[in-house]
Amino acid sequence: MNLHPTAIVEHGAQLGREVSIGAYAYVGANVVLGDGCRVLHHATIEGHTTLGEGCEVFPYAVLGTPPQDVKFRGERTTLEIGANNIFREMVTVHPGTGNGGGVTRIGDRNLLLIGAHVAHDCQIGSRCIIANYVQFAGHVHVEDFVNMGGHSAVHHFVTIGKHAFVGGMTRVAADVPPFLVIVAARGTRSEVRMVNGVGLERNGYGREDIAALKSAYMALYSRRARQNGIPIRDRIQTLLNTRPLNPQVEYLCEFLMRSFAHGRNGRYLESLRQDPVHRKSWKLEEKAEVPVQVVGHGKVHQSRVDGNDGSRDLFRLTARAEPGWAFAGWNGNPGDPPEADSIVVDPTRQMIATFKPL
């Protein structure tokens, strides 16, 4: 581990092997950094934030600070980041909110360039390139292999399909179809321009798939298709009824049908937002739990148990050490006998679980 003397790592933060933390960086008490993560000087990681192995956080990037949502009331929410992601200078990523599911997720091997912003409750896939100053509003879903051009801005609840390419300075207010390129048009509009052939070739798609997608694009978006008076939903359904149907074209058509037939303002997730059943499923339920601070490398599992008189809930805490570590005790007291790694406590207590290297 390489920890600069001016860096601040709060008590309770969990750091993997060969983690590097630069000068004046800050790592909060509830942060988990996987093996080989590099936090460069003046970077900040706060909140209940987890980074997978091999991530890099560049100067002045800020991850895990409270979401910019007036409905947020300080509830415990999380930011979950996969492996081998790069967050360049001044990138900001916020955790989820209680009304939006409680978690913001980012997959693996994404590149977020200078000044990009990922708002609360976003779900970002893997292997995406998010260029300088791209702005994702809350609840945006981005599938895998998406390429976002610089200064593009994405409206709340938009879904961006896999292998899509969004041109620079594009205003994205509706779902973006997979495999296609959209660019800024006149005024504040954006429009579908072509199939992302170059991106598909780079990611291993064959000529047959690309040709089928180009044919589908012509049937859906060409000037002749738009001028023949047939509604876009009918054009999509005609393609879906074609047999045999290329799997990539089928994925494209099903994505479009969700947006046009079931979406609201061109955004499928917006329609779910209006559905009371889905809204309830998004809302984060408040769960009582014992506040536990972990020192060293290990985890504490909690389960609810009934009290002797049945008048209040108690919690069983079970300590599980990571390989190469051993549980040492609760609140600084050695765990002897070994059964003490599992105890029952009142939820009003604040516990410290200590793990020591073997």
Question: Residue spans of the language-model regions?
Answer:
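Structural signal for interior beta-strand "rungs" in well-ordered beta-sheet cores
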Residues: 2-189
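Surface-exposed interfaces of beta-sheet-rich extracellular modules
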Residues: 313-340
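Conserved "repeat-terminator" motif of extracellular CCP/Sushi domains
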Residues: 286-293, 341-358
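Short coil/turn motif common to extracellular beta-sandwich-like domains
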Residues: 286-289, 310-316
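Short, solvent-exposed loop/edge segments of extracellular or virion-exposed proteins
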Residues: 291-306, 336
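Extracellular/surface recognition and adhesion modules
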Residues: 292, 298-300, 317, 327-330, ...
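Surface-exposed loops/turns
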Residues: 11, 311, 323, 345-347
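Terminal amphipathic alpha-helical/low-complexity segments used for targeting or macromolecular assembly
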Residues: 1-6, 11-12, 17-18, 54, ...
